[in-house]
């Protein structure tokens, strides 16, 4: 690897520390603010230089699109499980821009292992102990069997429900009698299974 200038080394150290502390790389604006640059564009030029030297990879289209590369990946702690926030229409649920933060939770605590966390909103699943504000541990998968509790995307809405398929129609059942099932006709509606619910962390109390 080609040697770094003092400023490049400073930026690389900032990126490493930010990932270690928050699980995410800094934005260009955050780099500029912390290191006293006049604009985010100045930070971008240094990032391009670091990418040319093989220290990082730049992923276009996202403000935190910075990834450590090569030898810089060594000694970096596992960031943990990503907590998924608001999911944009048409984007993969694990896209970096959907990640609010990372939690130090061992994926192997769950069977099958967890790939991400999703914050529960509402009480449609309260009768099986999935409550508003809980963190739902989810195993990434794209198929489900009848009776499984899944994270599903119907059109552009993400929901947690019990899965039932009858022919070309899927019913997503709540575990709360106040909520009617969601009926999805696969002939003319979009349904994506994002994962299987494998555990609950109650209101994030022990994170």
From Swiss-Prot:
InterPro entries (UniProt xref): LexA, LexA-like, LexA/Signal_pep-like_sf, LexA_DNA-bd_dom, LexA_repressor, Peptidase_S24_LexA, Peptidase_S24_S26A/B/C, WH-like_DNA-bd_sf
Active site: 124 (for autocatalytic cleavage activity), 161 (for autocatalytic cleavage activity)
Keywords: Autocatalytic cleavage, DNA damage, DNA repair, DNA replication, DNA-binding, Hydrolase, Repressor, SOS response, Transcription, Transcription regulation
Record bears the keyword Hydrolase: yes
Gene Ontology terms describing biological process: DNA repair; DNA replication; negative regulation of DNA-templated transcription; proteolysis; SOS response
DNA-binding region in chain numbering: 28-48
UniProt catalytic activity: Hydrolysis of Ala-|-Gly bond in repressor LexA
Top-level class of the enzyme under EC nomenclature: hydrolase
Pfam families given in the database record: LexA_DNA_bind (PF01726), Peptidase_S24 (PF00717)
Transmembrane region(s): none
Site (Cleavage): 89-90
Sequence similarity: Belongs to the peptidase S24 family.
Function comment: Represses a number of genes involved in the response to DNA damage (SOS response), including recA and lexA. In the presence of single-stranded DNA, RecA interacts with LexA causing an autocatalytic cleavage which disrupts the DNA-binding part of LexA, leading to derepression of the SOS regulon and eventually DNA repair.
Protein's name in the database: LexA repressor
